[in-house]
Amino acid sequence: ATQDSFLSVVLKYRCQILFTTRSNLNEYCTFQLKEIQDINILFQLTSAFYSEADKYRSTVEKIIETVHYHTFAVELAAKLLENGISTPGQLLAKLQEERASRDNEDKIKIIKDGQSSKATYYSHIHTLFSLYALSRKQQDIMCNLCFLPYTGISARIFAKWLELPTLNEINDLIETGFVQTTTRHTISLHPMIKEIALSETKPSVSSCHILLDSLQKICLMHGMEVAYYKKLFQTIGNIIELIEKDDIPKYLLFLENAFPYMDNYNHHKGMNGIIQELTGLLKTKNIGTDSDRALLLDFQATLETKPEKAIKLEKDALAQIETITADNARLVSNLHANLGGLYRMNGHPDLAREHM
């Protein structure tokens, strides 16, 4: 990864102790500082900046939990309560709604790295994590990292999904502290970093098309299994929840290709999530095609436990397509095969032969 231009200069000062966000200083004796998980200690930190902390202790503790025990965020929240017009209850509600509270316009003063500045609470969080200083490529990586499960995924697998030629950019993000990693080279985002990255990069179908295309290719490899399928499905679930749907046709195709692959693993939670998403989207008449609506009914039939209802759903799916064309012929053939299979399984061989 790229080295900071000032690091070698700083090291020449023969520092006894150097505090840094770098995590790759193998040639030195290092001690990793992690978040303080003891809420009593963080409450003491809050009390140092907020004079009425004891009066509102239960609410203050909820604020600490909401900002994920991040000490700088706790300090900012305390100063905002001391100097602003928000009550603890109001601030908690706003944090729970927007986490990194963009709308709170109360100005507070903070000193970080010897520099004094005034900004809103949200701007301070951005200043701390310096998202604006990232290169465009690194911002794109952060944008796509938002979809990873909290448990993370292999850095090499993720790099392959994004078609990155090397791990250099990811390693840079690890060294600056934006990306968390383990000894097994699993990468993930801290929850608060994820929230800020989501707000700042605004992941969309069009901006994350490389990731979606890569996941879709995996899902189209019928008969081929991947060892990390659980993390794959968690990533798809996060995409459904978080992505901006600015290219509906591409997004529908992504969902429709993911569903059968989940079916191979009997991943009913993910399958139900896709059905719910498609149902919501296709309620709008000008969204989707007859084939999209037929596929939705076919997916619903796949998870239906009652044979009669499953058969009706497959019939309804076929009824969606009035004219068979080159574009929908394969779908119609599959729908007939599925309906025939249901008839055969339920003791109707004559009806089954009509469709198989």
Give residue ranges: language-model regions.
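A conserved switch/coupling segment of P-loop NTPase cores
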Residues: 1-50
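Amphipathic alpha-helical segments of the small helical/lid subdomains adjacent to P-loop NTPase cores
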Residues: 33-76, 90, 168
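Loop-to-helix "switch" segment enriched in basic
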Residues: 42, 80-138
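C-terminal boundary/linker of central alpha/beta nucleotide-binding cores
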Residues: 75-82, 125-201, 208-209
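Extended alpha-helical scaffolding segments used for macromolecular assembly and cargo binding
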Residues: 207-295, 309
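Conserved alpha-helical positions within TPR/SEL1-like repeat arrays
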Residues: 256, 260-263, 292-305, 330-345
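Amphipathic alpha-helical segments of tetratricopeptide repeats
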Residues: 279-284, 316-323
